[in-house]
Amino acid sequence: MGGKHVAVLLGGFSSERPVSLSSGNACALALEGEGYKVTRVDVGRDVAAVLDELRPDVAFNALHGPFGEDGTIQGILEYLAIPYTHSGVLASALAMDKAQAKKVAAAAGIPVAGERVMNRFDFTSEHPLQPPYVVKPVREGSSFGVVIVKEDQSHPPQILTSSEWPFGNQVMVERYIHGRELTCGVLDGEALGVTEVVPLGHNFYDYDAKYAAGGSKHVIPAGISPKIYQKIQTLAVMAHQAIGCRGVSRSDFRYDDRFSEDGEVIWLEVNTQPGMTPTSLVPEMAAHAGRSFGDLVSWMVEDASCLR
């Protein structure tokens, strides 16, 4: 497997730069351990010129957030004819737009929460939905900008119309789903397993719960019935296929089992660029399934292509 020259794309200039640096450096170290020649490329606005001069055999995309997972870098790599990992242009752009991704998922028969897309400046003193509900930037990851509006809040939060809001004007408002945080990775069209994410000291799986030390506990395999476990794996594969993902993806779910074991399973979103440190969710699932981190990233390099 080794011998190829791999450019690991990391860093970038989105709000998820710190996450990308962690993912990229972890992947670079693992690939070096597998015998690949690795060049770390901290992505800037001149990335096309840098890659055109470097001409690697493969670009390992360890970017997160806008530019890295919205089809932009994928389009640059297609233009340069450099094979790359993860999903292609269309799937990346579609998955990054939460509202459009939900429409595609719903059309494929995947259960989603009711929602509406609106301009944040259209928020008035009246709630757009009956609380509780969740407000999400349409095109952000890592739970940046997510606001939960609770039952006892009489007005929408003021931050949404503040000049300090950095996440764009389009937001998605969806009903709040009570329940447990479950997530399922998909590799090469097959489910890797289901993990329950238990936030520690947080109301939901926000940025700090995801990335701060001790912010959450990962339970794998999730302590749910075999029926629900299989259902979530099936839905994750369906989402992977419906969106058109390639390589690896991760779908997030809410499972409300307060009233019955069957409960309600709701698909939240698919992540085409999931975190890639050894302790991130997808590598943990792969390890539980018997695939080492080095083997996982090597597989991704060998799977790389253009026209994904």
UniProtKB/Swiss-Prot annotation:
The reaction(s) catalysed by this protein are:
2 D-alanine + ATP = D-alanyl-D-alanine + ADP + phosphate + H(+)
Q: Which UniProt keywords apply?
A: ATP-binding, Cell shape, Cell wall biogenesis/degradation, Cytoplasm, Ligase, Magnesium, Manganese, Metal-binding, Nucleotide-binding, Peptidoglycan synthesis
Q: What is its EC number?
A: 6.3.2.4
Chain residues that bind Mg(2+) 2: 269, 271
Q: Where does Mg(2+) 1 bind?
A: 252, 269
Cofactor(s) for this UniProt protein: Mg(2+); Mn(2+)
Looking at the record, the residues that make up the ATP-grasp domain are: 102-302
What is the name of the protein in this document?
Answer: D-alanine--D-alanine ligase
Could you tell me which species this protein originates from?
Agrobacterium fabrum (strain C58 / ATCC 33970) (Agrobacterium tumefaciens (strain C58))
